[in-house]
Design a protein with these regions (language model features):
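Active-site-proximal helices and loops of the catalytic beta/alpha 8
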Residues: 6-264
């Protein structure tokens, strides 16, 4: 992995030539990521074009969308959470993240995402197609010095991505305070497939979503434990998925639920 800080001060053309040279000399398709700290998607796209997409960039606009959503609460329209982001516009070049060392409280770019909203953010970057997710150390382990707690469900999100977040994706961004999506799994990953429901207000659903006829009669459970009732997929592949108001539910097959092992 090649990485560079403050790439806005280095021409994209230079990185284009440099990365091609390194890959040719090593015979390896080394991935590369740069930090271009700007909330202006146009600037990031221009830079990626200038280096001919030879590198990825941290998705700073997505971080600021997360921050804004965590500050606004139910007034934020979740249907717009991906607007003007690399994850949406250039997913193959997006390194997605929730927070980092610079966005922590007291730092120069302070814009720490509210703790209540971090499950929502990690569900988006870990369980959707598009973008390469980057987990912040302090979110996984906590930071006692800054009195920042660990994101308790982050370990589960990581394992969900590894084992079950595969296959075709379909979005159900149906209301301001309630969105969801499904991943329909694939043949290569046993029990893969999931349904995600995110609420940032009083709306708990349900969302009527199509998992696919191959899941007919399958029983799904909420891995995060926010909903205790199980959901049975209809013979037509459709089902109603809910979540607790203001929280997140990730639904997987009962077999996947029972097999899920989280290493804390």
């Amino acid at each position: 992995m090649c990485s560079s800080d403050l790439v806005k001060h280095i021409s994209g053309e230079l990185f284009n030539d440099l990365l091609k040279y390194i890959r040719k000399q090593t015979g390896m398709e080394l991935p590369a990521v740069g930090e271009y700290w700007s909330n202006d998607l146009g600037r990031l796209l221009y830079y990626l074009d200038s280096c001919e997409n030879e590198m990825s960039l941290f998705d700073v606009p997505l971080h600021y969308n997360f921050f804004s959503a965590s500050q606004a609460g139910g007034a934020y329209d979740l249907r717009t959470i991906l607007d003007n982001t690399l994850m949406k516009e250039r997913p193959q070049n997006a390194v997605t993240f929730v927070d980092n060392h610079d966005t922590q409280r007291g730092q120069s770019l302070q814009s720490a995402v509210g703790d209540w909203f971090k499950d929502h953010c990690y569900a988006i970057i870990m369980l959707r197609q598009g973008g390469l997710p980057c987990v912040f150390y302090s979110d996984y382990h906590g930071n006692p010095v800054r009195e920042t707690p660990a994101v308790l469900n982050l370990g589960k999100m990581i394992m969900l991505r590894h084992f079950y977040a595969y296959g075709e994706q379909e979005d159900y961004f149906e209301s301001q305070n309630l969105i969801g999506w499904v991943r329909r799994g694939d043949e290569e990953h046993s029990n893969s497939g999931l349904a995600a429901v995110l609420s940032n207000g009083d709306n708990s659903g349900p969302l009527h979503m199509f998992m696919g006829e191959k899941f007919a009669d399958a029983v799904f459970s909420d891995v995060l434990g926010n909903c205790t009732e199980k959901v049975t997929i209809g013979k037509d592949g459709w089902a109603d998925f809910s979540c607790v108001p203001g929280r997140v539910s990730i639904w997987v097959t009962q077999e996947a639920f029972e097999n899920l092992i989280v290493y804390e």
